[in-house]
C-alpha cells in the first residue's frame, strides 16, 4: 500500500525547517538525480572537501575553547621540519587513556583533519604515534567497532548474516588514521597506516577486549583480532593504495560504499531536527546510547525526514568511500567464516620492524625529492585547528561554484 504524502502548511515550523534543509543542500550544490536521490556537485577531492567544510567549521567552533587552552601546552609536541631526520625516524605507539594530556593531544591532532573525524563507537583503541628520535608526534590512530552493515566487506569475507552476527567481534574499524605535518609531507601517512598491523596492536586488543561482551548482543565472546577495515573519505586514496612492505600487503582495496550517510547534515541542522522530534515526543530525539548501535544519528535524521515528509533518499549523498581491509590474521577470512577456530598471526611484525621498512620504502626517498617539509614550522599548526577561514585550508569555492550552476532542489 502506497504511503500517503505528508502535507505541511507553508507557514508552520515544519515548513521553515524543510526550507532550511533544502536551502542548505542547495548551498552545498546538490541537485536531484533522475531517480529522485541527491546528486553531488562533483566527485573531485576539492569538491568533497568543500562539502565537508561547514561540518568541519561547526566542529572547530565547538572546540575553540579547548583549542585555545590546549594549543599553548601541547604545541611543542609537533615538529618543526628542521627537527625531522627521515633516516632516523623511530616510531612508537602509545595507547591513549581518557582524561590524560595524551588524550588532549590526540583530540587536538584530530581537529587538523580536513574531513571531520568520528569519535568512534563501543570498543576503542586510540594511539599516538611518536618519533622517538626527536620526541615529536608523527600521527594518530583510532580503532573502534565496525559498522554492522557494510556490503563490500561482507561479500569479500563471504559472510552470511548469521556469520556476521557471531564473528563481527573479531573485526575493528580504523576510523582515524593519518600523519600530522611535517611527517605527512614525507609519506608518514603510509607509515601510520602500516603500524595498524603490528604485534603491539594485537597484544593491546587481546589484553583489553579478548574476553568481552558484544555491545548489541550483550553475549560474552572470545574475540581474536582478525581484520581491520578503513575507508578513504576523499575517494581513491594515494596514501592507502599500493600499501605493501616486502610481500605483505597492509591495506587491500575491496570496493566502494554506496554513498549513504549524514555528513551533509551539519551539527547545527541536526540539533534542529532533534528539537523537532523532541516536540513530537519521538523516541529518537535523545536516544544515543552505545547499546542502541552506531547508526543512531542516521536513524534520527531519517525519522525526522519521515515526519517532515522528506524522502529518505536525501540521506544518499552519492559520495562513495573506497573501502580497504587489513587482514591482521593470515587466516582472517577463514576465521570470520567459522572455518578456522584460532587466528594465525604468521609474519606479524613489531612497530620497530614496520617502521624500519616504511622508512626505507617511502619516507627517506620522498624526503630526498621533496624537501619542502624542512620549511614547516610548528606555529603553522594553529591555522589548521582554527575555525577562522584560512587561505590555506578553506576551499576557494563553495561546492555550488565548483561546477556549473544547476537546477535548485524543490519539492520533497
Per-region residue spans from a language model:
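Extended, composition-driven regions rather than compact fold-specific motifs
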Residues: 1-412
Amino acid at each position: 500500500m502506497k504511503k500517503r504524502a505528508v502535507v505541511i502548511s507553508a507557514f508552520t515550523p515544519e515548513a521553515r525547517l524543510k526550507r532550511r534543509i533544502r536551502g542548505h543542500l542547495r548551498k552545498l550544490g546538490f541537485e536531484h538525480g533522475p531517480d529522485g536521490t541527491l546528486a553531488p556537485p562533483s566527485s573531485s577531492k576539492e569538491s568533497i572537501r568543500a562539502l565537508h567544510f561547514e561540518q568541519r567549521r561547526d566542529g572547530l567552533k565547538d572546540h575553540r575553547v579547548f583549542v585555545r587552552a590546549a594549543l599553548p601546552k601541547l604545541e611543542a609536541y609537533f615538529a618543526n621540519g628542521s627537527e625531522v631526520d627521515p633516516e632516523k625516524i623511530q616510531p612508537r605507539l602509545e595507547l591513549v587513556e581518557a582524561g590524560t594530556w595524551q588524550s588532549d593531544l590526540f583530540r587536538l591532532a584530530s581537529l587538523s583533519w580536513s574531513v571531520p573525524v568520528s569519535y568512534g563507537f563501543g570498543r576503542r583503541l586510540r594511539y599516538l604515534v611518536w618519533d622517538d628520535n626527536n620526541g615529536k608526534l608523527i600521527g594518530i590512530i583510532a580503532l573502534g567497532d565496525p559498522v554492522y552493515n557494510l556490503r563490500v566487506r561482507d561479500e569479500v569475507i563471504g559472510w552470511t548474516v548469521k556469520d556476521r552476527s557471531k564473528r563481527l567481534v573479531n573485526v575493528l574499524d580504523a576510523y582515524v588514521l593519518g600523519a600530522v605535518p611535517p611527517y605527512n609531507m614525507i609519506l608518514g601517512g603510509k607509515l601510520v597506516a602500516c603500524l595498524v598491523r603490528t604485534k603491539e596492536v594485537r597484544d593491546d586488543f587481546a589484553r583489553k577486549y579478548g574476553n568481552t561482551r558484544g555491545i548489541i548482543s550483550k553475549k560474552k565472546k572470545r574475540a581474536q583480532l582478525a581484520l581491520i577495515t578503513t575507508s578513504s573519505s576523499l575517494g581513491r586514496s594515494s596514501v592507502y593504495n599500493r600499501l605493501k612492505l616486502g610481500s605483505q600487503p597492509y591495506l587491500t582495496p575491496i570496493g566502494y560504499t554506496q554513498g549513504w550517510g549524514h555528513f551533509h547534515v551539519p551539527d547545527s541542522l541536526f540539533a534542529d531536527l532533534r528539537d523537532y522530534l523532541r516536540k513530537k515526543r519521538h523516541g529518537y530525539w535523545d536516544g544515543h546510547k552505545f547499546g542502541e548501535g552506531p547508526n543512531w544519528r542516521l536513524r534520527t535524521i531519517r525519522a525526522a525526514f519521515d515526519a517532515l515528509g522528506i524522502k529518505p533518499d536525501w540521506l544518499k549523498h552519492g559520495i562513495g568511500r573506497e573501502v580497504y581491509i587489513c587482514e591482521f590474521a593470515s587466516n582472517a577470512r577463514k576465521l570470520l567464516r567459522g572455518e578456522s577456530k584460532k587466528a594465525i598471526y604468521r609474519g606479524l611484525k613489531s612497530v620497530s620492524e614496520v617502521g624500519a621498512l616504511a622508512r626505507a620504502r617511502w619516507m627517506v626517498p620522498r624526503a630526498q625529492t621533496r624537501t619542502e617539509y624542512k620549511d614547516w614550522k610548528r606555529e603553522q599548526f594553529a591555522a589548521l585547528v582554527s575555525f577562522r577561514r584560512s587561505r590555506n585550508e578553506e576551499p576557494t569555492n563553495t561546492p555550488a561554484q565548483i561546477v556549473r550552476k544547476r537546477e535548485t532542489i524543490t519539492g520533497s
